[in-house]
């Protein structure tokens, strides 16, 4: 899919395994004769003591490594041992009514924002057609939605004035963001149905997307904008080429 539209643009050591290496003290006397039982028991006990002492020393070293105390330049730095990975909590989707109005035929229309990512690829393709974006394979559209960190939508929901009428739901806007889930996010594919433009819905959609990312502790937010919408994004707080940083692109040359 087309971009939103230039960018307001850081050893686990495990104890060794031990094995017995045959030596003169392992129990065989000169010329292969077996030692006396008492000597055998004595040697066996001594061997066990030495093995226990060796294991104790190595285990002690392992424990000291695991405790995370590393001495360097006469200072002590505490290094916590790696903990079990914590599963990331799935953010709860948000849904709210941005606008409600009564139409000429008496029906009621609501414009609903949602961050649940509920998008029908055929509806999205139809919306892209309305704004003049080139068509992309539906499988790739579906993959882009599935792999996005956040997919926000605007739907028009029309409720008839008569009880027997059917509710109509139409996709009129969308924006999505990809992210490393920690520091950075990039906003893509911001679009609003032309018949709903000029009503502040695009601004409301973007403000909700930005707020949602900030609530998830992601504050480095970028996007790509063509010349026609640069001022729109500047009014939302985006800055072009901040501190001389340039967005760079690589395209295949074949």
From Swiss-Prot:
Pathway(s) this gene product operates in, as recorded in its UniProt entry: Aromatic compound metabolism; melatonin biosynthesis; melatonin from serotonin: step 1/2
GO MF annotation list: aralkylamine N-acetyltransferase activity; L-lysine N-acetyltransferase activity, acting on acetyl phosphate as donor; N-acetyltransferase activity
Protein keywords: Acyltransferase, Chloroplast, Melatonin biosynthesis, Nucleus, Plastid, Transferase, Transit peptide
Localisation per UniProt entry: Plastid, Chloroplast; Nucleus
Record field: transmembrane: none
Function: Catalyzes the N-acetylation of serotonin into N-acetylserotonin, the penultimate step in the synthesis of melatonin. Catalyzes in vitro the N-acetylation of tryptamine to produce N-acetyltryptamine, 5-methoxytryptamine to produce melatonin and tyramine to produce N-acetyltyramine.
Stated induction or repression of this protein's expression: Down-regulated by cadmium.
Reaction catalysed by this enzyme: serotonin + acetyl-CoA = N-acetylserotonin + CoA + H(+); tyramine + acetyl-CoA = N-acetyltyramine + CoA + H(+); tryptamine + acetyl-CoA = N-acetyltryptamine + CoA + H(+); 5-methoxytryptamine + acetyl-CoA = melatonin + CoA + H(+)
Gene3D superfamilies, alphabetized: 3.40.630.30
Protein family (similarity comment): Belongs to the acetyltransferase family.
Temperature dependence: Optimum temperature is 55 degrees Celsius.
All copies of domain N-acetyltransferase, residue ranges: 111-254
Species in which this protein is naturally found: Oryza sativa subsp. japonica (Rice)
Subcellular location, principal: plastid
Origin: domain of life: Eukaryota
InterPro entries given in the database record: Acyl_CoA_acyltransferase (IPR016181), GNAT_dom (IPR000182), NSI-like (IPR045039)
Gene Ontology biological process: circadian rhythm; defense response to fungus; melatonin biosynthetic process; mucilage biosynthetic process involved in seed coat development; negative regulation of seed germination; photosynthetic state transition; protein quality control for misfolded or incompletely synthesized proteins; regulation of anthocyanin metabolic process
pH-dependent activity: Optimum pH is 8.8.
PANTHER family for this protein: ACYL-COA N-ACYLTRANSFERASE, GCN5-RELATED N-ACETYLTRANSFERASE 2, CHLOROPLASTIC
Identification of the protein by name: Serotonin N-acetyltransferase 1, chloroplastic
Transit peptide: 1-74
EC identifiers of the protein: 2.3.1.87
Miscellaneous field: Plants overexpressing SNAT1 exhibit tolerance to cadmium, delayed leaf senescence, and increased grain yield due to increased panicle number.
């Amino acid at each position: 899919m087309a971009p939103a539209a230039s960018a307001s643009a850081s050893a686990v050591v495990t104890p060794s395994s031990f094995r017995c290496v045959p030596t003169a003290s392992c129990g065989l006397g000169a010329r292969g004769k077996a030692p006396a039982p008492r000597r055998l028991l004595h040697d066996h006990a001594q061997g066990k003591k030495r093995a226990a002492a060796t294991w104790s020393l190595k285990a002690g070293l392992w424990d000291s490594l695991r405790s995370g105390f590393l001495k360097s330049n006469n200072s002590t730095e505490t290094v916590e041992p790696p903990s079990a990975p914590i599963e990331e909590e799935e953010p709860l989707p948000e849904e709210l009514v941005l606008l409600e109005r009564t139409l000429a035929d008496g029906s009621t229309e609501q414009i609903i924002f949602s961050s649940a990512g509920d998008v029908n690829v055929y509806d999205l393709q139809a919306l892209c057609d309305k704004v003049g974006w080139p068509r992309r394979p539906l499988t790739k559209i579906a993959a882009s939605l599935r792999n996005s960190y956040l997919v926000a939508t605007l739907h028009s929901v029309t409720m008839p004035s008569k009880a027997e009428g059917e509710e109509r739901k139409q996709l009129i806007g969308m924006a999505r963001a990809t992210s490393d889930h920690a520091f950075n996010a990039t906003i893509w594919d911001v679009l609003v149905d032309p018949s709903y433009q000029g009503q502040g819905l695009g601004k409301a959609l973007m403000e909700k997307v930005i707020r949602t990312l900030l609530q998830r502790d992601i504050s480095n937010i970028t996007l790509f904008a063509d010349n026609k919408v640069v001022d729109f994004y500047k009014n939302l707080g985006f800055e072009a080429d901040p501190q001389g940083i340039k967005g760079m692109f690589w395209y295949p040359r074949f």
